[in-house]
């Protein structure tokens, strides 16, 4: 007997239009009517998932940040797996040496050591990777500026103060223009 359906978001739950199809919504409702729980499982931060949950009136739990956080239906963290702050400093020392957009996913949202302009460039690179349906640089810029992830980004001006705060860090994300440099960074972090 099936007790739970857990679905990834991108390319599974949501389609290339970044919406949930009527067919998927009906399947979720049908499963729930049979007593089967539905959950979203994603590498995204919960703050990126919540608008979708609200828009489609989903009543579900969520595993976010590649398993780093588990949320109940009300959006409360039930379980979190976080990175030791000493390890965070080591990771940042390596990541901040290159030409990378560095994002830090925490229990209090996402942060970056980059400037707003650098973050926008990183969001545009990310959009070009994941949203091939856009047709021009102006569409990529418009998409990046309207993205809730960009709008809600927190900017770190003092890394020491940030690390002294009560923030809990679950994940790092980085994007670079050179695949070779990204591979080199990965090797340094291993």
Q: Which stretches of residues belong to each language-model region?
A:
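Small/polar loops that bind or transfer phosphate-bearing groups
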Residues: 16, 40-41, 174
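Residues embedded in well-ordered beta-strands within globular domains across many folds
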Residues: 6, 62-63, 173
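Asp-based phosphoryl-transfer active-site loop
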Residues: 3-18, 91
